[in-house]
Swiss-Prot record:
Provenance organism: Homo sapiens (Human)
Bilayer disposition of the protein: Multi-pass membrane protein
Disease: Salla disease: Sialic acid storage disease (SASD). SASDs are autosomal recessive neurodegenerative disorders characterized by hypotonia, cerebellar ataxia and intellectual disability. They are caused by a defect in the metabolism of sialic acid which results in increased urinary excretion of unconjugated sialic acid, specifically N-acetylneuraminic acid. Enlarged lysosomes are seen on electron microscopic studies. Clinical symptoms of SD present usually at age less than 1 year and progression is slow. Infantile sialic acid storage disorder: Severe form of sialic acid storage disease. Affected newborns exhibit visceromegaly, coarse features and failure to thrive immediately after birth. These patients have a shortened life span, usually less than 2 years.
Any one annotated GO CC term: synaptic vesicle membrane
Main location: membrane
Protein name as annotated: Sialin
Length: 495
């Protein structure tokens, strides 16, 4: 007897158009074992790669505190008196051998923001190049270049603010190709019914990189000095690159150690989804409403993500008035929750498709709604509860944690609608989604001149409203099947 839940899940207009060859009604290849498989080895190596990507991105946020002369930052102290002190001030005695710089708050903002000015430039070129030559070398050298540049951060800082800003922008150029390149690789490696699992494992490394690198950078600064933060993470990046080049291949056909059974399983599952066209159908891509649904969702999600990533430590310190030790731990807690949520939601999403017969579109909608509406609700709640420290931390943690559901929602929808051009599509959406990282924190700072609870409520309400709009837009206009323009004959209809 058929489950009515399954029937409902399929009743979204996709019954005859969901081009996922492993769904019921199409030939089903027996899944190749997971243990020691080439595709899961790729996911694990990618996990550590994106761990390093985010460690290299956020380590400066911690090191900068130790790089700047405390007398300079005291002039910019904006700690609010709206909430009472609830922890005793601590005296931090640690290694002070690192050089100090006279950088005011505005200069520090330019240093931290310069990364995104490079990052936004290489999104679309990265996706295009990956679609032509493969993502392995592009991703590898993108991280290697960023790691090597990170090693030169102390020298650049000594030379002045200008060289340091240029260095960070160059690091952004290197990291800008990483996500599009990875998407391009998964278009050849991820069977449709394993996409959520494989991609959530890969990209969850970014969240864990944030969780670990924030407190670890603080520990390195405490016991050594800030220069070793950059030497440590830069060296780790170089070691990862050597493993990546040795163990990974662009496609299953090129992999030297993949089993014949696994290779045939992957290739057969993707047989009706990939295009052999050499030219990129730019006009149909840019006219595609499902692509713009992802753009809007990606932009909306990142507005909240980057606002919290850059300003959560500020909110913890200046409004909730946690001391520096508590702040480091509590600011990383939401990303630990998000990491766990990404891993678990990937498993759940693929189970809904494989075992419960939910359509691709239905799963992407459900997970995007949870991952965007949920954070919006708890962000608003965090603004309402004011100085209740425990609830504020709990709500902000839950908000960021629920955002992890999006890793199985709009975040991988590029592979559903155009697997052959997934890297290019991610480059397009991530270009727009980088804008919040550049302007969101600036707008938030301008909205909180007096650092009152009411001003921060406005910041949270705006982020929540943008999230809700993105969720609704994606739900209305997203698709879950390969689009006609992404197939060999994009002027005809594929049956």
């Amino acid at each position: 007897m058929r489950s009515p839940v399954r029937d409902l899940a399929r009743n979204d207009g996709e019954e005859s158009t969901d081009r996922t060859p492993l769904l019921p009604g199409a030939p089903r290849a027996e899944a190749a074992p997971v243990c020691c498989s080439a595709r899961y080895n790729l996911a694990i190596l990618a996990f550590f790669g994106f761990f390093i990507v985010y460690a290299l991105r956020v380590n400066l946020s911690v090191a900068l505190v130790d790089m700047v002369d405390s007398n300079t930052t005291l002039e910019d102290n904006r700690t609010s008196k709206a909430c009472p002190e609830h922890s005793a001030p601590i005296k931090v005695h640690h290694n002070q051998t690192g050089k100090k710089y006279q950088w005011d708050a505005e200069t520090q903002g330019w240093i931290l923001g310069s990364f995104f000015y490079g990052y936004i430039i290489t999104q679309i070129p990265g996706g295009y190049v990956a679609s032509k030559i493969g993502g392995k070398m592009l991703l590898g050298f993108g991280i290697l270049g960023t790691a090597v540049l990170t090693l030169f951060t102390p020298i650049a800082a000594d030379l002045g603010v200008g060289p340091l800003i240029v260095l960070r922008a160059l690091e952004g150029l290197g990291e800008g190709v990483t996500f599009p390149a990875m998407h391009a690789m998964w278009s050849s490696w991820a069977p449709p019914l394993e996409r959520s699992k494989l991609l959530s494992i890969s990209y969850a490394g970014a969240q864990l990189g944030t969780v670990i690198s924030l407190p670890l950078s603080g520990i390195i600064c405490y016991y050594m000095n800030w220069t070793y933060v950059f030497y440590f993470f830069g060296t780790i990046g170089i070691f990862w690159f050597l493993l990546w080049i040795w163990l990974v291949s662009d496609t299953p056909q090129k992999h030297k150690r993949i089993s014949h059974y696994e290779k045939e399983y992957i290739l057969s599952s993707l047989r009706n989804q990939l295009s052999s066209q050499k030219s990129v159908p730019w006009v149909p891509i840019l006219k595609s409403l499902p692509l713009w649904a992802i753009v809007v969702a990606h932009f909306s999600y990142n507005w909240t993500f980057y606002t919290l990533l850059t300003l959560l430590p500020t909110y913890m310190k200046e409004i909730l008035r946690f001391n520096v030790q508590e702040n480091g731990f509590l600011s990383s807690l939401p990303y630990l929750g998000s990491w766990l949520c990404m891993i678990l939601s990937g498993q759940a999403a693929d189970n809904l498709r494989a075992k419960w017969n939910f359509s691709t579109l239905c799963v992407r909608r459900i997970f995007s709604l949870i991952g965007m509406i949920g954070p919006a609700v708890f962000l608003v709640a965090a603004g309402f509860i004011g100085c209740d420290y425990s609830l504020a931390v709990a709500f902000l943690t839950i908000s960021t944690t629920l955002g992890g559901f999006c890793s199985s929602g709009f975040s991988i929808n590029h592979l559903d609608i155009a697997p052959s051009y997934a890297g290019i599509l991610l480059g397009i959406t991530n270009t727009f989604a980088t804008i919040p990282g550049m302007v969101g924190p600036v707008i938030a700072k301008s909205l909180t001149p007096d650092n009152t609870v009411g001003e921060w409520q406005t910041v949270f309400y705006i982020a929540a409203a943008i999230n809700v709009f993105g969720a609704i837009f994606f739900t209305l206009f997203a698709k879950g099947e390969v689009q006609n323009w992404a197939l060999n004959d994009h002027h005809g209809h594929r049956h």
